[in-house]
Amino acid sequence: MKYCLHSRLSNEYLLKANEIKVKYRDNKSVFDLFEKYPEATIILEESLAGEEFNWNDIIKYNKIAQGRFMLCLGDIAMATKAKELGIPFYMGYPVKTFYELEGLKNLGVSYVRIDVPIFFSMNKVKAFGVPVRVAVNVAYVDMLPRDNGVCGLWIRPEDAWMYEEYVDVFEFSGCEISKEEALYRIYAEQKEWPGELQMIISNLNYPGLNRMILPEVTDSRLNCGQRCVQGGACRICYRALDLANRDKIRAYVEAIDQL
């Protein structure tokens, strides 16, 4: 599994990164990043919607990089320009439907960042043949009201290996430097997390000790189609977290002791 880290992280972590993402407002640092991290792909990301790029500079970056440069964009017009210039790119927003995925494939993206519900149909996503990236620490990214994020996108560190067949890059979104570094250690190095799952997954507001959750839960989530929100009867995610709820475990143990 490849890991993408933001350029603001310390040198200790950037040396381990497969990809380093830098905001366009800091694009003057791209040359330094090429030199300091010769094994990493440098991703230049739009800082603001509608931001104007200096395409002459970007052409230079791409030429010097020799296959280690890419753009992360939010605007289709800019994506079309990048395609015309032969510069690798992908759209930074999460893809939720197969219709979007097909359109982006036809556009010529180098990656797609996926979100629910297609996150729960990994075999179908794989069939499109487009490299996939996932922000593993965010249960949902829209501003719609949600109960708790239980039926959202979350990947346990222990189960990251199950996604290697489907996902090419893990990244971390919307967190401070110290938390992103901690998440890298947890997912890439320790590969386990004993505490509450909601402590490492943003927008997951439901208790459950991660060490008590069985890997079979993830095996079920890979291709379940998120039928739980389509009128289906599946409650696996809720049951898994309920069985890992420390208060419920304590109450169960106390009840057993009283027998």
Language model region names:
Residues M1-L259:
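Active-site pocket-lining/capping segments in soluble small-molecule metabolic enzymes
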